[in-house]
């Protein structure tokens, strides 16, 4: 008898609302701070007005505009849930593994979920263009496609080390007619200042954010935020809202929800619709575990305090786990994990002990990626691979308890454009 591995939600059952966790948090989220008195004014100028409004909304559910919903369908939503039956067998049969496959979107990752909303709202404001940062290129690719679909120009500031290490993501953005700049770049005043201090800098997401904000501010565009802030997480919860319906359809209730954190939007987008329900009931049964890169240990070695989300310190300060906005991470290939801080809502949940954190080295994560590819056939993005080592911990817990555990994992993107990076670390190029 055939065993089902793919679980699809019909297009006509796609969720029509985003979920906002703010009203369900265990305590109020600390307010942003503006020491200079200028940051809030800058935000009002550079963010789409509706995005800024939704950033502080206390409404639990927000209706998705029909124009955005239609384009969700166009780019591959709803995405399937895949059961990793062969990996379950390899790990001894102690756990059931369900993967929310955000790799199935047209750009190959979860990032398109919020890019469409941000760009749509920028278009409503009659923006001349949109600008944003990108690390590995996943967010940049998503903004490039969203901009093409809404017929508006995109300027993407790509962290310099990834710009050269991941040329195919750059080419994908250019296929969508985006203009892509290595960050720090000669294209902006701030970029030139950074390069003057260190011509060989690998760049950082903090620097790229600063360039994108300055460029929008000085040239009549709108800046679109790729992670961290509440509104971006809100837009991405379409993935978690779908997954909740799918798990109910399958007849499973996850014991663990796991995923990786760059700024936090990927993990939060999957986990929050499940966690919010538990917070409203006053009891959290599931285990929520988020992982990152040990080379950028903001979750495990960071401090929960107010810090700037960007290197130039032009945006309001947010209370979050951080290793410092000036931190320049090692040029690891999981570019999306190289951000210095964690989203304020996720930081609060970590601080309260509701969400646990883990960090893994590039070598360990990539070894798991190779194993996973051999067993299941899917090649995970370098970022996504950092969630896989959590499985060994869950297997040990299942062994001790004597109960089979169900895991839901955010398969946040594929690694088909990152094979050269895998080859470098795993030694494929050695004669």
From Swiss-Prot:
Gene3D superfamilies for this protein: 3.40.50.1100
Family label: Belongs to the TrpB family.
Biological role stated in the UniProt entry: The beta subunit is responsible for the synthesis of L-tryptophan from indole and L-serine.
Lineage: Archaea, Thermoproteota, Thermoprotei, Sulfolobales, Sulfolobaceae
InterPro entries reported for this sequence: Trp_synth_b-like, Trp_synth_b_CS, Trp_synth_beta/beta-like, TrpB-like_PALP, TrpB-like_PALP_sf
SUPFAM superfamilies per UniProt: Tryptophan synthase beta subunit-like PLP-dependent enzymes
Listed transmembrane segments: none
One annotated GO molecular function: pyridoxal phosphate binding
Matches recorded under Pfam families: PALP
Modified residues (N6-(pyridoxal phosphate)lysine): 111
Cystine connections: none
PANTHER family noted in UniProt: TRYPTOPHAN SYNTHASE, TRYPTOPHAN SYNTHASE-RELATED
Pathway(s): Amino-acid biosynthesis; L-tryptophan biosynthesis; L-tryptophan from chorismate: step 5/5
EC class name: lyase
Binding partners and assembly: Tetramer of two alpha and two beta chains.
NCBIfam families associated with the record: PRK12391.1 (NF009057), trpB_rel (TIGR01415)
EC identifiers of the protein: 4.2.1.20
Entry cofactors: pyridoxal 5'-phosphate
GO CC annotation terms, alphabetical: cytoplasm
Record's keyword terms, sorted: Amino-acid biosynthesis, Aromatic amino acid biosynthesis, Lyase, Pyridoxal phosphate, Tryptophan biosynthesis
Official protein name in the record: Tryptophan synthase beta chain 2
Catalyzed reactions: (1S,2R)-1-C-(indol-3-yl)glycerol 3-phosphate + L-serine = D-glyceraldehyde 3-phosphate + L-tryptophan + H2O
Annotated gene: trpB2
